[in-house]
Amino acid sequence: MLALAAGFVYLAVLSGDPVYTVYEWMSPARFQRYDRLIHIVAAEHQLDPMLVKAVVWRESRFDPEKHGSRGERGLMQVTEKAANEWARENKIADFHPDQLFDPKTNLEAGTWYLHRAVEHWKLQSDPVPFALAEYNAGASRAQRWSKNDATDTSARTFLKNVDFPATRKYVESIIDRYEFYQRRGRM
């Protein structure tokens, strides 16, 4: 029994967020409630569902009613500007930003935006850190941090250029969570 407990503690620490991991073990339904929807929406946008779930984990801890400090809404903390771009691009009439509190709408808008960012950085050998920085801080800042270099820049070099500590931590925490999901083989 002690070995089992030690194993759980080890996995919790390894996750990068032991408190969250313990909560996930104690209440798996809360943390898996949107997995099916994440799989569907991620597939529509050719993204790994584990990456999308890692973004949801970081942005809202799976709270579809979360309000951000700058007006972000829902599971993926989508901004009104990004949501309006998504609605316009997808010809969604009568879109209202409060619809972002609907998990499906939020995941569709957020995943669309993330996919667009990944596509923007597809020439990089690992576009994910670049796309996450763009998702968090905007395209112009991510471009500046890449030094406007179209050639392949390492993720490590790029992250060193990120002069917003909160954005650097944001990217690193999502990548850590994404790798955690990959290591355990499930979301």
Pin down the residues of each PLM region.
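Solvent-exposed, polar/charged alpha-helical surfaces in well-ordered, non-transmembrane soluble domains
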Residues: 36-40, 49, 53, 84, ...
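Catalytic and substrate-binding regions of cell-wall glycan-acting enzymes that process beta-1,4-linked
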Residues: 130-187
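Substrate-binding/active-site groove segments that recognize
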Residues: 70-93, 108-114
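Inter-helical turn/loop segments and adjacent helix faces that build the functional surface
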Residues: 120-127, 152
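Solvent-exposed loop/turn segments at secondary-structure junctions
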Residues: 60-63, 82-85, 137-142
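Hydrophobic membrane-insertion alpha-helices, especially the h-region
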Residues: 1-15
